């Protein structure tokens, strides 16, 4: 079972309307690799991808005859790639290739028709690398909307401006959009706690993003059968895989003007499926995830005062100790790094200005957020540090100068 990669879902919208309990499923058999040759296992099988209640994505294979699930792998974004093996004579052999290490799993298609093979392959890669928002599959009515559905350029600003502070906290807090949805996914403990405007977030019932989930074996179900002859197993093929070809997906969706006043629930649904656009070019694009690296954060996290301020924001639970070591583990985890990258992208989009204004941030920070200038926003936040902190920094600098004069 693979446990590397990022846990937080992506903000890329997609077609998630299937009522099936599996995100995608298709009939396929396994293949065994010996040396450089793969040999088909002639059993009837089913490949499916499932998102469990803990939001983890499982790639599974089960025997359709016995109902036994033989492979149940937890996959994180960018862990692996599913692609066709062109060396196979039948052209219907696919490989799940892990980017870290040499692990590869081969499958041969057992669907009677070939016209959906590439579509199944595309969907597998989409769901493995862009998991849907928790609860997005069950949502109805407003899925697929974009911000343009708010009714013009000023729609979002107008809606946010008329919200109370409690409504904003409901929207972007840790419980606002299912714990991991919308803007809550961008910030982990919630945007308010990240910006320092408010107390520590409430304890979440979700497990730590670094915890390993046990393999989930779904109840055995009998897959639907068709009165068509079963496809024949492919001949043994070479397992040599070519370099991955770039895949492309059409994530465009049609926006429609709302027929009635927009409610808070509508905005929540929109944010849960919105795609973060490119920044308007107000400043140089900065990816916070590439700036706040473990090497840069290490000396900062070694400061006892910093540790004391961060401890209340750690995930709480019986198996989650709130220690300085846990701070280090949290901030250096792939999950936190991806969440930081998502927040950086949202900030660079220039759409978070109204939210920053609602939280009473300095005018410089709001202006930078409106422009999508991440670097200017960070500088504005640094300049707006509490007077006590600035006084302490000034005192330390003065002491250093006095020590130098004594030398």
Swiss-Prot record:
Compartments reported by the entry: Cytoplasm; Nucleus
Post-translational modification: Ubiquitinated by UBE3C in response to proteotoxic stress.
Keywords: Acetylation, Cytoplasm, Isopeptide bond, Nucleus, Phosphoprotein, Proteasome, Ubl conjugation
UniProt modified residues of type Phosphotyrosine: 127
Gene Ontology annotations of biological process type: proteasome assembly
Region of interest (Interaction with PSMD1), residue spans: 2-132
Keyword Nucleus among UniProt keywords: yes
Primary residence: cytoplasm
Pfam families: Rpn13_ADRM1_Pru, RPN13_C
Cited InterPro entries: DEUBAD_dom, Rpn13/ADRM1, Rpn13/ADRM1_Pru, Rpn13/ADRM1_Pru_sf, RPN13_DEUBAD, RPN13_DEUBAD_sf
Highest taxon of the lineage: Eukaryota
Domain called DEUBAD: residue spans: 277-391
Family: Belongs to the ADRM1 family.
Function noted in UniProt: Component of the 26S proteasome, a multiprotein complex involved in the ATP-dependent degradation of ubiquitinated proteins. This complex plays a key role in the maintenance of protein homeostasis by removing misfolded or damaged proteins, which could impair cellular functions, and by removing proteins whose functions are no longer required. Therefore, the proteasome participates in numerous cellular processes, including cell cycle progression, apoptosis, or DNA damage repair. Within the complex, functions as a proteasomal ubiquitin receptor.
Protein name per its UniProtKB record: Proteasomal ubiquitin receptor ADRM1
Lineage: Eukaryota, Metazoa, Chordata, Craniata, Vertebrata
Gene: ADRM1
